[in-house]
Each structure stands twice: as structure tokens, then as C-alpha cells.
UniProtKB/Swiss-Prot annotation:
InterPro entries: GCS_T (IPR006223), GCS_T_bac (IPR022903), GCST_C (IPR013977), GCV_T_N (IPR006222), GcvT/YgfZ/DmdA (IPR028896), GcvT/YgfZ_C (IPR029043), TrmE/GcvT_dom1 (IPR027266). PANTHER family: AMINOMETHYLTRANSFERASE, AMINOMETHYLTRANSFERASE, MITOCHONDRIAL. The keyword Repressor does not apply. It catalyses: N(6)-[(R)-S(8)-aminomethyldihydrolipoyl]-L-lysyl-[protein] + (6S)-5,6,7,8-tetrahydrofolate = N(6)-[(R)-dihydrolipoyl]-L-lysyl-[protein] + (6R)-5,10-methylene-5,6,7,8-tetrahydrofolate + NH4(+). HAMAP family: GcvT. Its EC number is 2.1.2.10. It holds the Pfam family GCV_T. It comes from Rippkaea orientalis (strain PCC 8801 / RF-1). This is Aminomethyltransferase.
């Protein structure tokens, strides 16, 4: 795997004897100990993830939010400084180019708006090209921080208590999806109360040397290092979409059940709006639903979904997660079959296995901020 990219935390991760895997061109830890232990650490205590492979953009310019408005279905202009919005970049067909988080940082002394945007690792260059082709670079400066910064996710009900020891500012005062420019280990940092686990937590962006020191400090403080395996089971229990599996260029946010980030009534035109308006008026033909399997059969990505013996859809993600304790999956099925309680089948290695449509998310944390 010598041709793969590595994050600045790679050597530390190897020292901690992580099992490695390829992910979107990066050599990343899939697990450090047992996946179940890492998963449960995040659900009951606190864990940390190296997510430095994700794309990181810093934008600044006049009417920045107004410019970004045209690229997403969410109303970004309602954001106050220190607030963030999970949203999607859309193509003209209403398909999802990527799911992203826009962190609005406010206005500079010269009247320019500032924002950080975090994107998926596998779509960083694609997103960068799309953004630069649609933004006025005479008015907006675009800086790609992807190779310059470390990004560490500290997740779990004890994340405030564990991370606070290394942060100067009071983390308890930061709201969910809030963020600020603060101080970690006496050095500048960007800190956000966001995550991809369904638990309370923070994502911290710092310079590489600071990131290495923070990783060591958190580890010494008893924070469990976690790999991509636990990250996947955690996000799936929380029914969070994974780009290129659950959503892609050919799925719209309404099909994916992301209706809550489509703000048709409070904003003007945006790329793909006509498609979403039509889908909202007529209803989508297919929906991303949650499935619970009977027994311990695990439905995997690409497995056919059947109804009365006929293939009607496809599984996008599936696992047997530690907290839920039952095999679960996400799948696209016709709208008429998306009602909770609908019996379906999934073909697993030539065998039709029973499944039922259930409400999402599969797990809702009692500790969620």
C-alpha cells in the first residue's frame, strides 16, 4: 500500500498497532482493537478518529453565503456566525455531488464573509473543481487546507470532559453544530461540535504537529482510538448516509430522506431546484428506508431487495452493529413499499432472507447534546 496517501498521524497509528486498509486512496486504520470495543467506547464513554483524510476548504469573500446558496438546497443565509449546516452539493439533475458541512465564521473587518467547508475524502478534488467553476474567484478566495491540517474527531458522551483538558475555551458553552476558533494545547485550532457517530462530540482541526500532540495526549488520557470499522457501524446505527454507497450523483436528497435540508420555501433558485420541486409535488419514485433483518443474516451493499418474489430495490449499506444487536440495512425501494412495517426480503448468497421496514434511525443516543 506504499502508493497510498497517509495522514500526519499515520506513524502514531502504526505504533498503536492499528490494522490498516485502503479508503479513497488513503492508508487508514480500520480498527485498533476489537471493533465492538471501539464502537461501545463511543456509545458509552469516548473515542477518537483520525479523519485528516477528509477535504478541508477555507473560503472568504463578499456575499460568500449568497454565492454558495446557488449550489445547495439549504438556506445558508439564515446561518449566524458560529453556526454550521449539513447540506449537499447538487448537479442539474438534482443528484448529490457530495454531502458537506458549511461552517459560517462571520464577517471580517473588511466586510468579507468567511466559512470552512468539510467534504468527503474521495470527492475532495471533484468538489474543489465544482466549487471553483461556480464561484467568482475575483470576489472569493478559496484555500485548500486538505494537506495542511489534521482533523481529529472526539466522539462520545464523555467527549467534553476528555477534550476540555486540552482546550482553553469552555466546550460546554458550544451548541450542537456550533463552532469557534480556539486554542488547543496553546495553539490555534478550529473546533466544531459535529460528528458522524450519532453521539455528542467534537471535530478539531489543527496544524500537523499540534494534531500529533493532541492524539498522544488524548490517548494518554484514556480516549479509545477507533478505526473506520467502528465509524461505519456507528454512523449506520444512526442512519447517516455514506457517500458513494447510500447517496451519489444519481440520488436526490428527497429520495435519500434528507428532506430536512431542502429549504424550498425560504430561498431562491439553486442548481437542481426544478427537479426537487417536481419530486416534492409528485412524490419520489423510490425512498431510502431502514431494514431490520430476521435472524443474523447481514445484508451488504448491492444485495437485491425483493417483494413477493420480485426484485424491487437494492441494499446500500448493512451490518450487525453492537448497540442495536440486530442486523440492519439501508436500501432503496419503491415509495409504495417504504412504509414502516412492510415485509420485504433480501437475497443473501442465493437465499431470500426476511426483512421488515423500520423507522430510522436505528439508534438514537440518550446522550446526544
Amino acid at each position: 500500500m506504499s502508493n497510498l496517501l497517509r495522514t500526519p498521524l499515520f506513524d502514531l497509528i502504526v505504533q498503536q498497532k492499528a490494522k490498516l486498509t485502503e479508503f479513497s486512496g488513503w492508508e487508514m486504520p480500520v480498527q485498533f482493537s476489537k471493533l465492538k470495543d471501539e464502537h461501545q467506547a463511543v456509545r458509552t464513554d469516548v473515542g477518537m478518529f483520525d479523519i485528516s483524510h477528509m477535504g478541508k476548504f477555507a473560503l472568504q469573500g463578499t456575499e460568500l453565503l449568497k454565492s454558495l446558496q446557488f449550489l445547495v438546497p439549504s438556506d445558508l443565509e439564515r446561518l449566524q456566525p458560529g453556526q454550521a449546516q449539513y447540506t449537499v452539493l447538487l448537479n442539474p439533475q438534482g443528484g448529490i455531488i457530495d454531502d458537506i458541512i458549511v461552517y459560517y465564521q462571520g464577517i471580517t473587518e473588511t466586510g468579507e464573509q468567511r466559512a470552512n467547508i468539510i467534504v468527503n475524502a474521495g470527492t475532495t478534488e471533484k468538489d474543489k473543481t465544482w466549487l471553483l467553476s461556480h464561484l467568482d474567484t475575483q470576489k472569493i478566495t478559496f484555500k485548500d487546507l486538505s494537506g495542511e491540517k489534521v482533523l481529529i474527531a472526539v466522539q462520545g458522551p464523555q467527549s467534553v470532559a476528555k477534550l476540555q483538558a486540552f482546550v482553553q475555551e469552555d466546550l460546554s458553552q458550544v451548541g450542537f453544530f456550533g463552532h469557534f476558533e480556539g486554542t488547543v494545547l496553546t495553539k490555534p485550532a478550529f473546533i466544531a461540535r459535529t460528528g458522524y457517530t450519532g453521539e455528542d462530540g467534537f471535530e478539531v482541526m489543527v496544524d500537523p504537529e499540534v494534531g500529533q500532540d493532541l492524539w498522544r495526549s488524548l490517548f494518554q488520557a484514556g480516549v479509545t482510538p477507533c478505526g473506520l470499522g467502528a465509524r461505519d457501524t456507528l454512523r449506520l446505527e444512526a442512519a447517516m448516509c455514506l457517500y458513494s454507497q447510500d447517496i451519489d450523483d444519481n440520488t436526490t436528497p428527497l429520495e435519500a430522506g434528507l428532506n430536512w435540508l431542502v429549504h424550498l420555501d425560504s430561498k431562491g433558485d439553486f442548481i437542481g431546484r426544478d427537479i426537487l420541486e417536481k419530486q416534492k409535488a409528485q412524490g419520489v419514485e423510490r425512498r431510502l428506508v431502514g431494514l431490520q433483518m430476521e435472524g443474523r443474516h447481514i445484508a451488504r451493499h448491492g444485495y437485491p431487495v425483493l417483494y413477493e418474489g420480485k426484485i424491487v430495490g437494492e441494499v446500500t449499506s448493512g451490518t450487525l452493529p453492537p448497540t442495536v444487536g440486530k442486523a440492519i440495512a439501508l436500501a432503496y425501494v419503491p415509495r409504495s413499499l417504504g412504509k414502516v412495517g412492510t415485509p420485504l426480503e433480501v437475497e443473501i448468497r442465493g437465499q431470500n432472507c426476511q426483512a421488515i421496514v423500520v423507522k430510522k434511525p436505528f439508534y438514537r443516543s440518550p446522550n446526544r447534546f
